């Protein structure tokens, strides 16, 4: 049954991509492209938090928007958004198919800031896949590449998320000092970009984890308490991570 379902999913992905490739031959005029890209950015902003809650619903919406879009770059941006949904539903094979299709598209295009954004999204998702299967060396390389590409792009407001992934990869490799440095850079990026404070709690409890491992409980408490101040505004999965980390922190302190 599971194998049959995987085949259906792959067939649907290739069917959708067929429409994408047909539409990729003739991009619209600049005004249309600008309007469509703004529509994508609005879609991403509105549905971003829902990916972790209703991933399949967001995926279906993204596929529908992708079919409606005329410009090929916009189509592939919608396709890239489905990558997060496959990660949430643990359909890593499907995610890898989509990543390869996006990479193939990028290789046929001229370099630009928008292409850097799209390629950064792919490398970030590749890093997440490597992290999911425990290949942290490859994950760290992908996250670093995603960060470098995003800094050449236009949507740098997502850089703190990539830096958190990079910090976590270094922590899991045992490079705690480097992990802490990436977390601190993420905080600096949040401040310099005037990003909402709701982005900061995951960085705070990431730093708390680093310091409890280093047995620096004063710094651990400081960052963990900062994270706790935003508990009411956390998403359900963020609350789970926060509370789970709370148990781990107190267990570590007891030993």
List PLM regions with ranges.
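N-terminal leader/linker segments that initiate helical-solenoid repeat arrays
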Residues: 25-78
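Flexible helix-coil transition and linker loops at the boundaries of alpha-helical arrays
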Residues: 64-73, 105-116, 150-156, 190-197, ...
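Conserved small/polar residues in nucleotide/adenosyl-binding loops
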Residues: 250-255
């Amino acid at each position: 049954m599971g194998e049959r379902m995987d085949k259906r999913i792959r067939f649907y992905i290739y069917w959708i991509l067929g429409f994408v490739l047909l539409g990729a031959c003739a991009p619209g005029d600049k005004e249309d492209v600008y309007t469509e890209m703004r529509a994508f950015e609005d879609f991403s902003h509105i549905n971003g938090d829902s990916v972790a809650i209703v991933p399949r619903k967001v995926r279906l919406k993204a596929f529908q928007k992708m079919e409606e879009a005329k410009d090929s770059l916009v189509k592939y941006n919608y396709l890239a958004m489905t990558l997060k949904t496959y990660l949430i539903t643990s359909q890593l094979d499907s995610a890898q198919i989509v990543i390869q299709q996006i990479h193939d598209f990028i290789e046929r295009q001229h370099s630009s800031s928008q292409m850097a954004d799209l390629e950064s999204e792919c490398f970030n998702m590749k890093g997440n896949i490597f992290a999911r299967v425990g290949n942290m060396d490859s994950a760290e390389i992908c996250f670093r590449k995603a960060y470098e590409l995003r800094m050449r792009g236009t949507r740098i407001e997502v850089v703190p998320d990539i830096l958190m992934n990079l910090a976590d990869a270094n922590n899991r490799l045992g490079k705690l000092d480097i992990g802490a440095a990436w977390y601190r850079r993420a905080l600096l990026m949040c401040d310099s970009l005037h990003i909402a404070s709701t982005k900061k709690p995951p960085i705070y409890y990431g730093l708390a984890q680093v310091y409890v491992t280093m047995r620096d409980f004063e710094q651990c408490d400081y960052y963990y308490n900062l994270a706790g101040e935003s508990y009411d505004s956390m998403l359900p999965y963020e609350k789970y991570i926060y509370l789970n980390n709370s148990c781990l922190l107190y267990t570590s302190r007891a030993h």
